[in-house]
Curated annotation (Swiss-Prot):
Keywords, in A-Z order: Cytoplasm, Glycosyltransferase, Magnesium, Metal-binding, Nucleotide-binding, Purine salvage, Transferase
Role, per record: Purine salvage pathway enzyme that catalyzes the transfer of the ribosyl-5-phosphate group from 5-phospho-alpha-D-ribose 1-diphosphate (PRPP) to the N9 position of the 6-oxopurines hypoxanthine and guanine to form the corresponding ribonucleotides IMP (inosine 5'-monophosphate) and GMP (guanosine 5'-monophosphate), with the release of PPi.
Claim: rRNA-binding is one of the keywords in the record: no
Designated name of the protein: Hypoxanthine-guanine phosphoribosyltransferase
Key word Ribosomal protein present: no
Gene: hpt
CC cofactor: Mg(2+)
């Protein structure tokens, strides 16, 4: 049923798992013995973070934030709202934000600046997808699985109006679905 709304599949579940394994190995090497705090940005990061955790072979702690800049549409509102903050004291910690996608960059820039102000030792960003064409602020991810074209994608945590997150792959949503 859901697949009928997909114009084309960009990345299969197998593709995503392979890239996530590679990223897990990189984070293992970069953070061995450091016990970083991985902060998942909800809701979209859940499938990616769950898969990534399986492939990190060093001690890590996890926490979550709910941050919004979309409010249900297909374009960012420009206003970043923190709906749920982390429970962990991040002072002196190495923090890695786990994101499903970086588009405008506003959310991650806001979070990175906020955590630096809170005196995190380091603040890095790991994302499943980076959409550089959508960038409106100067921020780059430190770890990127895929650079993607400026298309509206869904699946593996990415949504349109809270739907399609449960697709095991990532595909381009048909325009007639989101232009209604």
């Amino acid at each position: 049923m859901l697949e009928n709304d997909i114009k084309k599949v960009l990345y299969s579940e197998e593709d995503i798992i392979l890239k996530t394994k590679e990223l897990g190995a990189k984070l293992t090497a970069d953070y061995a013995g450091k016990n970083p705090l991985l902060v998942g940005v909800l809701k979209g990061s859940v499938p990616f973070m769950a898969e990534l955790l399986k492939h990190i072979d060093t001690h890590v702690e996890i926490d979550f934030m709910v941050v919004s800049s979309y409010h249900g549409g297909t374009t960012s509102s420009g206003e970043v709202k923190i709906l749920k903050d982390v429970d962990t004291n991040i002072e002196g910690r190495d923090v890695i934000f786990i994101e499903d996608i970086i588009d405008t960059g506003r959310t991650l820039k806001y979070l990175r600046d906020m955590f630096k102000y809170r005196q995190a030792n380091s603040v890095k960003v790991a994302t499943l997808f980076d959409k550089p064409e959508g960038r409106l602020v100067d921020i780059d991810a430190d770890y990127v699985c895929y650079d993607i074209p400026n298309e509206f994608i869904v699946g593996f945590g990415l949504d349109y109006a809270e739907n399609y997150r449960n697709l095991p792959y990532v595909g381009v949503l048909k325009e007639e679905i989101y232009s209604k």
